[in-house]
UniProtKB/Swiss-Prot annotation:
Catalytic residues as annotated in Swiss-Prot or TrEMBL: H66, D112
Organism, as annotated: Bungarus multicinctus (Many-banded krait)
GO BP: arachidonate secretion; lipid catabolic process; phospholipid metabolic process
Purpose of the protein: Snake venom phospholipase A2 (PLA2) that inhibits neuromuscular transmission by blocking acetylcholine release from the nerve termini. PLA2 catalyzes the calcium-dependent hydrolysis of the 2-acyl groups in 3-sn-phosphoglycerides.
UniProt-recorded name of the protein: Basic phospholipase A2 beta-bungarotoxin A-AL3 chain
Assembly information from the UniProt record: Heterodimer; disulfide-linked. The A chains have phospholipase A2 activity and the B chains show homology with the basic protease inhibitors.
UniProt keyword ATP-binding, yes or no: no
């Protein structure tokens, strides 16, 4: 399984988008080279904005778990996951999160790390891209 590594810097990314940029980079590191991270933004019932119903497959479950992880970070730890910056390293086909355990930096990084690794280990089923969520996600 080939892995793509991005060398793009974050210097010109506005601060309000840096966490999503970091998550995107994690995803790009773990998914097959023939896929782009954008293919994961409207997949199943949970990959992308919002989510409802039962996940359609293992990949969609990765997004469901990620959504819940962000929800827990907000409710239990008073974090703002979409704005939270964190330190991490992409190395040897895995992702290492830095920061003290229990801090928002570490909690959010762990959410993104877990999801990205899950994406890399889950089959991408083309028919679950852009599904009719009103019909399949109840």
């Amino acid at each position: 399984l080939a892995v793509c590594v991005s060398l793009i810097g974050a210097a010109n990314i506005p601060p309000q988008h840096l966490n999503l940029y970091q998550f995107k980079e994690m995803i790009r590191y773990t998914i097959p080279c023939e896929k782009t991270w954008l293919e994961y933004t409207d997949y199943g019932c949970y990959c992308g904005y919002g989510g409802s119903g039962t996940p359609v497959d293992a990949l969609d479950r990765c997004c469901y778990v990620h959504d819940n992880c962000y929800g827990d970070a907000e409710k239990k730890h008073k974090c703002n996951p979409k704005m939270q910056l964190y330190s991490y390293k992409l190395t040897k086909r895995t992702i290492i999160c830095y920061g003290a355990a229990g801090t928002c930096e570490r909690i959010v990084c762990d959410c993104d790390r877990t999801a990205a690794l899950c994406f890399g280990n889950s089959e991408y089923i083309e028919r679950h891209k852009n599904i009719d969520t009103k019909r399949y996600c109840r």
